[in-house]
Amino acid sequence: MPIRCLALLLPLLLGSTSTLAGNAWSAIAYPLSGSPQVIGSYTAGCVAGAGALPLVGEGHQVMRPSRNRYYGHPKLIALVERMGRETAARGGRLLIGDLAQPRGGPMPSGHRSHQSGLDVDIWFLQQPRDRILSRAETEQIEMPSMVRATEGALNASRWSPRYRDALKLAALSPEVERIFVNAIIKQALCQSETDRAWLNKVRPWWGHDSHFHVRLACPRDSALCQPQKPIPPGDGCDADLVNWVRDIRQAALSPKPYRRPEPPSADRLPAACNAVLNSPTAWKR
Protein backbone atom coordinates (compact mmCIF):
# COMPACT_ATOMS: atom_id res chain seq x y z
CA MET A 1 0.00 0.00 0.00
CA PRO A 2 1.43 3.45 -0.90
CA ILE A 3 2.67 5.45 2.10
CA ARG A 4 0.32 8.31 1.19
CA CYS A 5 -2.73 6.00 1.41
CA LEU A 6 -1.52 4.55 4.70
CA ALA A 7 -1.21 8.05 6.12
CA LEU A 8 -4.77 8.79 5.11
CA LEU A 9 -6.02 5.62 6.79
CA LEU A 10 -4.02 6.00 9.99
CA PRO A 11 -6.64 8.06 11.88
CA LEU A 12 -9.23 5.38 11.15
CA LEU A 13 -6.92 2.60 12.25
CA LEU A 14 -6.29 4.39 15.52
CA GLY A 15 -10.02 4.34 16.07
CA SER A 16 -10.66 7.63 17.84
CA THR A 17 -14.11 7.90 19.37
CA SER A 18 -14.71 11.19 17.60
CA THR A 19 -14.14 9.55 14.22
CA LEU A 20 -16.30 6.52 14.97
CA ALA A 21 -19.01 8.66 16.58
CA GLY A 22 -22.04 7.42 18.46
CA ASN A 23 -23.20 4.71 16.06
CA ALA A 24 -19.99 2.75 16.57
CA TRP A 25 -20.94 2.15 20.19
CA SER A 26 -24.30 0.68 19.18
CA ALA A 27 -22.53 -1.75 16.83
CA ILE A 28 -20.64 -3.41 19.67
CA ALA A 29 -21.89 -6.89 20.49
CA TYR A 30 -20.28 -7.67 23.84
CA PRO A 31 -19.14 -6.01 27.05
CA LEU A 32 -15.43 -5.58 27.67
CA SER A 33 -14.33 -8.28 30.09
CA GLY A 34 -12.45 -7.50 33.26
CA SER A 35 -13.13 -5.63 36.46
CA PRO A 36 -16.04 -3.18 36.26
CA GLN A 37 -15.01 0.43 35.63
CA VAL A 38 -17.18 3.45 34.91
CA ILE A 39 -15.41 6.11 32.84
CA GLY A 40 -16.66 9.66 32.39
CA SER A 41 -20.10 11.07 33.12
CA TYR A 42 -23.65 9.88 32.67
CA THR A 43 -23.93 11.89 29.44
CA ALA A 44 -20.38 11.40 28.13
CA GLY A 45 -18.91 8.13 29.25
CA CYS A 46 -18.53 4.38 28.86
CA VAL A 47 -18.29 1.25 30.98
CA ALA A 48 -15.93 -1.72 31.09
CA GLY A 49 -16.83 -5.01 32.70
CA ALA A 50 -20.57 -4.50 32.30
CA GLY A 51 -23.04 -7.28 33.00
CA ALA A 52 -26.11 -8.26 31.00
CA LEU A 53 -29.50 -8.17 32.68
CA PRO A 54 -31.35 -11.44 31.98
CA LEU A 55 -34.20 -10.75 29.57
CA VAL A 56 -36.58 -12.53 31.95
CA GLY A 57 -35.93 -12.89 35.65
CA GLU A 58 -37.78 -13.20 38.91
CA GLY A 59 -40.14 -10.23 38.87
CA HIS A 60 -38.75 -8.47 35.79
CA GLN A 61 -38.74 -8.58 31.99
CA VAL A 62 -36.69 -6.50 29.55
CA MET A 63 -38.62 -4.48 26.99
CA ARG A 64 -37.33 -3.68 23.48
CA PRO A 65 -34.55 -6.30 23.72
CA SER A 66 -33.76 -5.83 20.03
CA ARG A 67 -32.09 -2.53 20.96
CA ASN A 68 -29.39 -4.44 22.88
CA ARG A 69 -29.48 -1.90 25.68
CA TYR A 70 -29.76 -4.21 28.68
CA TYR A 71 -26.21 -3.91 30.01
CA GLY A 72 -24.91 -2.10 33.05
CA HIS A 73 -22.44 -1.95 35.88
CA PRO A 74 -22.91 -5.05 38.08
CA LYS A 75 -24.31 -2.83 40.84
CA LEU A 76 -27.07 -1.71 38.47
CA ILE A 77 -27.84 -5.28 37.42
CA ALA A 78 -28.01 -6.30 41.09
CA LEU A 79 -30.38 -3.43 41.90
CA VAL A 80 -32.81 -4.32 39.09
CA GLU A 81 -32.79 -7.99 40.05
CA ARG A 82 -33.40 -7.18 43.72
CA MET A 83 -36.25 -4.82 42.83
CA GLY A 84 -37.68 -7.58 40.65
CA ARG A 85 -37.60 -10.10 43.47
CA GLU A 86 -39.30 -7.70 45.87
CA THR A 87 -41.90 -6.81 43.24
CA ALA A 88 -42.56 -10.52 42.61
CA ALA A 89 -43.12 -11.01 46.33
CA ARG A 90 -45.95 -8.48 45.99
CA GLY A 91 -47.42 -10.24 42.97
CA GLY A 92 -46.02 -8.04 40.20
CA ARG A 93 -43.42 -8.03 37.42
CA LEU A 94 -41.38 -4.96 36.48
CA LEU A 95 -40.99 -4.00 32.84
CA ILE A 96 -37.45 -2.78 32.26
CA GLY A 97 -36.57 -0.25 29.59
CA ASP A 98 -33.10 0.83 28.50
CA LEU A 99 -29.99 0.41 30.61
CA ALA A 100 -26.84 0.91 28.51
CA GLN A 101 -25.19 -0.59 25.45
CA PRO A 102 -22.64 -3.39 26.02
CA ARG A 103 -19.82 -0.90 26.59
CA GLY A 104 -21.94 2.17 27.20
CA GLY A 105 -21.22 5.22 25.10
CA PRO A 106 -23.65 7.41 23.16
CA MET A 107 -26.75 5.87 21.62
CA PRO A 108 -27.99 6.78 18.14
CA SER A 109 -31.46 7.53 19.51
CA GLY A 110 -33.49 7.86 22.66
CA HIS A 111 -31.11 9.21 25.29
CA ARG A 112 -28.35 11.67 26.02
CA SER A 113 -27.48 9.84 29.22
CA HIS A 114 -27.42 6.05 29.81
CA GLN A 115 -23.78 6.09 28.68
CA SER A 116 -21.91 4.88 31.76
CA GLY A 117 -23.84 1.79 32.83
CA LEU A 118 -25.44 3.47 35.84
CA ASP A 119 -28.88 4.40 34.43
CA VAL A 120 -32.03 2.31 33.97
CA ASP A 121 -35.55 3.14 32.84
CA ILE A 122 -38.33 1.24 34.62
CA TRP A 123 -41.85 1.38 33.28
CA PHE A 124 -44.61 2.39 35.65
CA LEU A 125 -46.84 -0.20 34.00
CA GLN A 126 -46.32 -3.64 35.51
CA GLN A 127 -47.46 -7.15 34.67
CA PRO A 128 -48.76 -9.86 36.98
CA ARG A 129 -45.89 -11.90 38.42
CA ASP A 130 -46.79 -15.04 36.48
CA ARG A 131 -47.28 -13.39 33.09
CA ILE A 132 -44.31 -13.35 30.72
CA LEU A 133 -44.76 -11.28 27.57
CA SER A 134 -44.00 -12.72 24.15
CA ARG A 135 -41.03 -11.36 22.22
CA ALA A 136 -43.45 -9.53 19.92
CA GLU A 137 -45.19 -7.95 22.90
CA THR A 138 -41.91 -6.73 24.37
CA GLU A 139 -41.23 -4.91 21.11
CA GLN A 140 -44.72 -3.52 20.49
CA ILE A 141 -46.47 -2.67 23.76
CA GLU A 142 -46.48 1.08 24.34
CA MET A 143 -45.76 2.79 27.65
CA PRO A 144 -48.96 4.47 28.88
CA SER A 145 -48.66 7.97 30.31
CA MET A 146 -49.62 8.38 33.95
CA VAL A 147 -50.44 12.10 33.76
CA ARG A 148 -53.01 14.44 32.29
CA ALA A 149 -50.53 17.06 31.20
CA THR A 150 -53.05 19.70 30.10
CA GLU A 151 -54.63 19.52 33.56
CA GLY A 152 -51.37 19.29 35.46
CA ALA A 153 -52.73 16.25 37.26
CA LEU A 154 -52.08 12.55 37.74
CA ASN A 155 -54.22 10.19 35.66
CA ALA A 156 -55.95 8.47 38.55
CA SER A 157 -57.53 5.85 36.29
CA ARG A 158 -54.07 4.54 35.36
CA TRP A 159 -52.03 5.15 38.48
CA SER A 160 -51.57 2.37 41.00
CA PRO A 161 -50.09 2.23 44.51
CA ARG A 162 -47.78 -0.45 43.09
CA TYR A 163 -46.04 2.21 41.01
CA ARG A 164 -45.47 4.33 44.08
CA ASP A 165 -44.08 1.26 45.87
CA ALA A 166 -41.57 0.63 43.06
CA LEU A 167 -40.44 4.25 43.16
CA LYS A 168 -39.98 4.15 46.92
CA LEU A 169 -38.13 0.85 46.72
CA ALA A 170 -35.60 2.44 44.36
CA ALA A 171 -35.34 5.67 46.36
CA LEU A 172 -34.57 3.83 49.59
CA SER A 173 -31.72 1.89 47.96
CA PRO A 174 -28.44 3.44 49.15
CA GLU A 175 -26.69 2.96 45.81
CA VAL A 176 -29.31 5.07 44.01
CA GLU A 177 -28.21 8.68 43.54
CA ARG A 178 -31.41 10.13 42.06
CA ILE A 179 -34.61 9.22 40.20
CA PHE A 180 -36.18 11.27 37.42
CA VAL A 181 -39.97 11.45 37.12
CA ASN A 182 -42.46 13.82 35.55
CA ALA A 183 -43.05 16.79 37.85
CA ILE A 184 -46.79 16.06 37.92
CA ILE A 185 -46.07 12.63 39.41
CA LYS A 186 -43.77 14.11 42.02
CA GLN A 187 -46.40 16.70 42.88
CA ALA A 188 -48.95 13.92 43.47
CA LEU A 189 -46.49 12.10 45.73
CA CYS A 190 -45.83 15.30 47.67
CA GLN A 191 -49.56 15.54 48.29
CA SER A 192 -50.11 11.90 49.24
CA GLU A 193 -47.06 10.96 51.31
CA THR A 194 -47.02 11.56 55.05
CA ASP A 195 -43.28 10.85 55.34
CA ARG A 196 -41.72 12.69 52.42
CA ALA A 197 -38.05 12.21 53.28
CA TRP A 198 -37.59 9.59 50.53
CA LEU A 199 -38.82 12.07 47.93
CA ASN A 200 -35.48 13.91 48.13
CA LYS A 201 -34.06 11.56 45.48
CA VAL A 202 -37.14 11.88 43.25
CA ARG A 203 -36.35 14.74 40.88
CA PRO A 204 -38.71 16.46 38.40
CA TRP A 205 -37.85 16.33 34.71
CA TRP A 206 -39.45 16.63 31.29
CA GLY A 207 -41.15 13.51 29.95
CA HIS A 208 -40.83 10.57 32.35
CA ASP A 209 -44.62 10.30 32.59
CA SER A 210 -44.67 6.63 31.58
CA HIS A 211 -41.47 5.44 33.24
CA PHE A 212 -39.02 6.49 35.93
CA HIS A 213 -35.29 6.81 35.40
CA VAL A 214 -33.07 5.41 38.16
CA ARG A 215 -29.47 6.61 38.37
CA LEU A 216 -26.78 5.10 40.56
CA ALA A 217 -23.99 7.04 42.21
CA CYS A 218 -20.43 6.60 40.98
CA PRO A 219 -18.98 3.34 42.34
CA ARG A 220 -16.17 3.95 44.80
CA ASP A 221 -13.73 1.83 42.82
CA SER A 222 -14.28 3.76 39.56
CA ALA A 223 -11.80 6.61 39.88
CA LEU A 224 -12.62 7.99 36.41
CA CYS A 225 -16.36 8.22 37.03
CA GLN A 226 -17.60 11.82 37.06
CA PRO A 227 -20.42 12.45 39.57
CA GLN A 228 -23.21 14.99 39.35
CA LYS A 229 -23.65 17.83 41.78
CA PRO A 230 -25.27 16.63 45.02
CA ILE A 231 -29.03 16.91 45.35
CA PRO A 232 -30.08 19.91 47.48
CA PRO A 233 -31.41 19.01 50.94
CA GLY A 234 -35.14 18.73 51.52
CA ASP A 235 -37.99 16.80 49.96
CA GLY A 236 -38.27 19.03 46.88
CA CYS A 237 -41.98 19.69 47.46
CA ASP A 238 -41.49 23.41 46.99
CA ALA A 239 -42.10 26.42 44.76
CA ASP A 240 -39.67 25.12 42.17
CA LEU A 241 -41.82 22.00 41.75
CA VAL A 242 -44.90 24.20 41.31
CA ASN A 243 -43.07 26.02 38.51
CA TRP A 244 -42.15 22.71 36.88
CA VAL A 245 -45.79 21.61 36.81
CA ARG A 246 -46.89 24.99 35.46
CA ASP A 247 -44.34 24.81 32.64
CA ILE A 248 -45.31 21.25 31.71
CA ARG A 249 -48.99 22.18 31.64
CA GLN A 250 -48.35 25.24 29.49
CA ALA A 251 -46.23 23.21 27.08
CA ALA A 252 -49.06 20.67 26.73
CA LEU A 253 -51.67 23.38 26.16
CA SER A 254 -49.55 25.16 23.55
CA PRO A 255 -47.44 22.44 21.94
CA LYS A 256 -44.62 23.36 19.60
CA PRO A 257 -43.68 21.34 16.52
CA TYR A 258 -41.58 18.36 17.52
CA ARG A 259 -37.93 18.52 16.56
CA ARG A 260 -36.01 15.30 16.86
CA PRO A 261 -32.86 16.02 18.88
CA GLU A 262 -29.49 15.33 17.38
CA PRO A 263 -27.91 12.12 18.68
CA PRO A 264 -25.18 12.75 21.25
CA SER A 265 -21.68 13.11 19.89
CA ALA A 266 -18.76 10.91 20.86
CA ASP A 267 -16.41 13.90 20.73
CA ARG A 268 -16.85 14.60 24.44
CA LEU A 269 -15.94 11.12 25.63
CA PRO A 270 -12.86 10.71 27.85
CA ALA A 271 -9.77 9.42 26.06
CA ALA A 272 -9.88 6.26 28.17
CA CYS A 273 -13.05 5.23 26.33
CA ASN A 274 -10.96 4.66 23.18
CA ALA A 275 -9.56 1.45 24.66
CA VAL A 276 -13.01 0.31 25.77
CA LEU A 277 -14.43 0.86 22.29
CA ASN A 278 -11.62 -0.60 20.23
CA SER A 279 -10.61 -3.76 22.07
CA PRO A 280 -10.89 -7.05 20.10
CA THR A 281 -14.08 -9.12 19.67
CA ALA A 282 -16.28 -6.06 19.91
CA TRP A 283 -18.13 -5.87 16.64
CA LYS A 284 -21.38 -7.48 15.62
CA ARG A 285 -21.44 -5.99 12.12
Stretch-by-stretch model annotation:
Residues 7-16:
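Bacterial N-terminal signal peptides
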